Amino acid sequence: MEAGCEGSSPQTLGERTMGEEGERVKPFTPEKAKEVIMSLQQPAIFCNMVFDWPSRHWTAKHLSKVLEGKQIRFRMGLRSTGTVPQFETECSYVDATLEEFLAWNCDQSRISGPFKKYDHSKFWAYADYKYFVTLFEDKTDVFQEVMWSDFGFPGRNGQESTLWIGSLGAHTPCHLDSYGCNLVFQVQGRKRWHLFPPEDTPFLYPTRIPYEESSVFSKINVVNPDLKRFPQFQKARRHMVTLSPGQVLFVPRHWWHYVESLDPVTVSINSWIELEEDHLARVEEAVTRMLVCTLKTAEDPHHPRTWLNPTEVEETSHEVNSCYLNSAVCAFFDHCERAKEVEMQAPRANGEEPGVQEHMEVEQARDPSSDVGAGKQEAASPFGPDLVPVTPASEERGGALEGDSQECTSRNGEHCAELPCARRQQASKGARAEAGQSAPRYPVAPSRVFVSTDDLLDCLVNPQVTRMVAQLLIQGKSL
């Protein structure tokens, strides 16, 4: 798809679904859309759901007029970084207006101002994680132009949303979000998403350095991996899709993702949807914060910026982190009590009262990395022309859904098929078995062994370990 200097404008969607009087009807009611979102265990693209959103016109040029010269922070990165991920701690930052960004993106011959040090052919710029409540603090009326209520979340709008504006090559390193699931509305330009399921976590080499609350990074540059250093990555099952204007991508809980801009200008809007599992995840994150801050501060108390992500304002004291942990544990118990009161009103077959352990088991059963609940999709698949699954097969076809946002079809004209549930379960079990057998029983030590603080932290705050610690904390306090 050709794109001009400003980038691709949002496309007009085809009027395929009409009501009795000729008005356009969305393929899913809010109730049905929410039901689908809460039951899906794999990424999928919603089509024809945002044709009436005022925010569909939010090109970067339009937003530059709305913001009226307001400065925002851009992350500057190199277009080529080899096999090493370009973490945010390795980037530089520029405060500029959208007008200055668009000028830099279009005309290098007359460039001046904050971007003058950055050669457009070598650098990309990304205004990422821009929360509406901060960006539009004096223009709150624009919140209503984003209508997540159409997906079954009444009252949810721009106030709970984040804006992303980038140039060609701008990307976020591969990571998973600790909380919630994600809805992403592509407004302008195209973005390519590389996604990996939660059960592939051992193959993604997770790390918490740089540290950012609620983000687990991968040590791998997934678009140019170092397979000698990270051989297990070959076992990961990449799901790749190109998101076009007018489409909304659903990213389930704990799915790894690397996102890159394919056009000169891209604009996206997203919202993280809270889930029941987040209550326990907050305990896990509090444990992680305490361990990372304690060990890294002791190692290098004078240079926190070497390990702290720029999104984190400052490192916190042990006392403050202890308060975070206790607050998270108390909040979990408060949630259990409220849930217990609700369940007490419903008759139970065995007459027993639900306990904390039961709530933990329920949350674990809802974990997308488990096999429980995976059969829901098999009973009644919601997929069709307006809801297209992102599967490994999409990657084999060269990244389906790349062209026309009207139909959400692959290049060969066929809709992407869902990976059969039984096959998905078998692949998941096989991957976990391989992960457990990957290390030799008696590993051979190299000639020189040096265990760094980061090496230790990679073990201590591995997602599997922090989940176990959080569960032990909850169980210990509930006895």
From Swiss-Prot:
Organism: Rattus norvegicus (Rat)
Tissue expression remark: Widely expressed. Highly expressed by Sertoli cells in testis (at protein level).
MF (Gene Ontology): 2-oxoglutarate-dependent dioxygenase activity
SUPFAM superfamilies the UniProt entry points to: Clavaminate synthase-like
Basic and acidic residues compositional bias, start-end: 356-369
Pfam families linked: Cupin_8
Disordered: region residues: 1-25, 347-412
JmjC domain segment(s): 124-288
Name of this protein: HSPB1-associated protein 1
Gene it is expressed from: Hspbap1
Region Interaction with HSPB1, residue ranges: 88-208
Keywords: Cytoplasm
